[in-house]
Amino acid sequence: MQIQIVCVGKIKDAYISSGVVEFEKRLRPYGKIFITELAEVKIPDNASASDELRVKEREGELILANVKEGFFKIALDPNGMSLSSEEFSDVFRDAKLSGKNLCFIIGGPLGLSPKLLQSVEKKLSLSRMTFTHPMTRLILLEQVYRAFRILNGEPYHK
Ligand SMILES: C[S@@+](CC[C@H](N)C(=O)[O-])C[C@H]1O[C@@H](n2cnc3c(N)ncnc32)[C@H](O)[C@@H]1O
């Protein structure tokens, strides 16, 4: 199975980057995981709500242009569905059984556009609280790792 994570914006904090590198390494035995990091679209000074919407829409277009052909799209969204870690591991079991590849999408500082959120197959919430986009990347990777450990009956999840 291939897993793509498309995200907008760089990680600036070393403590998050090293966590991301660690979980990418731990995930290597379970499939091809690759991260597509896109540059943030510049937010104009004193941006109005419509300027911000334009930024999110442009980022949404760039995201969709970078999703690998045929991948099942899951957007990370605080208002999406919430799953237990066991239920999240079922997402990978089902994808494996049906031969699907998955693409997780993380927005930039302004979030994802309504158009993008309408175009994806699923929306996943990690919590009703809002995280920074780098933190979301790290938490998602840890949960993907946890899901594979659960799926394979390997120790980690308690
Ligand atoms: C700083 S947040 C954007 C906040 C923005 N106000 C919004 O409504 O999406 C950046 C990105 O991180 C992801 N994110 C943040 N918190 C999340 C959560 N609790 N669950 C899922 N994704 C989250 C989303 O993909 C979001 O677009």
UniProtKB/Swiss-Prot annotation:
One of its GO terms (cellular component) is cytoplasm. It is an enzyme of class 2 (transferase). Keywords: Cytoplasm, Methyltransferase, rRNA processing, S-adenosyl-L-methionine, Transferase. It catalyses: pseudouridine(1915) in 23S rRNA + S-adenosyl-L-methionine = N(3)-methylpseudouridine(1915) in 23S rRNA + S-adenosyl-L-homocysteine + H(+). Signal peptide: none annotated. The keyword S-adenosyl-L-methionine applies. It is found in: Cytoplasm. One of its GO terms (molecular function) is rRNA (pseudouridine-N3-)-methyltransferase activity. It comes from the Archaea. Its EC number is 2.1.1.177. Pfam families: SPOUT_MTase. S-adenosyl-L-methionine binds at residues 76, 107, 126-131. Specifically methylates the pseudouridine at position 1915 (m3Psi1915) in 23S rRNA. Belongs to the RNA methyltransferase RlmH family. HAMAP family: 23SrRNA_methyltr_H (MF_00658). This is Putative ribosomal RNA large subunit methyltransferase H. The lineage of its organism: Archaea, Methanobacteriati, Methanobacteriota, Stenosarchaea group, Methanomicrobia. The gene is rlmH.
